[in-house]
């Protein structure tokens, strides 16, 4: 279980599926941006307005979709200007980034799966949605991404939340925000 919880001074946020420099994501997921430049500026502005230094952002996969070395470098530059400490639970599009030391240094922790704490609550972080997770019967939460806004084929399960950019206003969210949103 993640031991960073004891060192966090601010809030804990979650997000996934930034898909920086994935030109097709705007069209594929009907994102409300004219181009990648507009999307990146929007995400950086919203992120840095909400997340403060001392906060922690747990990114649950797919930070980008690099076509080449320049895209990898651009994603690293963008991540470095985003506020807050960062942890990464890798997604299916993160492999190319993991080869870069300058990318790995941006994160306090990198894992494929994480069972962590958010205050006194336990959270299972995995890029893909899981039907039943560690602590499921004891009140733990599962936070995932990958599906963007396409949840039509997913069974609705209590305490399982999509933290993807596409369904959360393109900004990281807290567990409390997800719980409140689910009650509406």
Stretches found by the model and what they are:
Residues 5-6, 79, 154:
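Sterically constrained small-residue positions within well-ordered secondary structures
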Residues 9, 53-54, 83-85, 120, ...:
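A general structural motif
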Residues 102-184:
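Conserved beta-sheet core of the metallophosphoesterase superfamily
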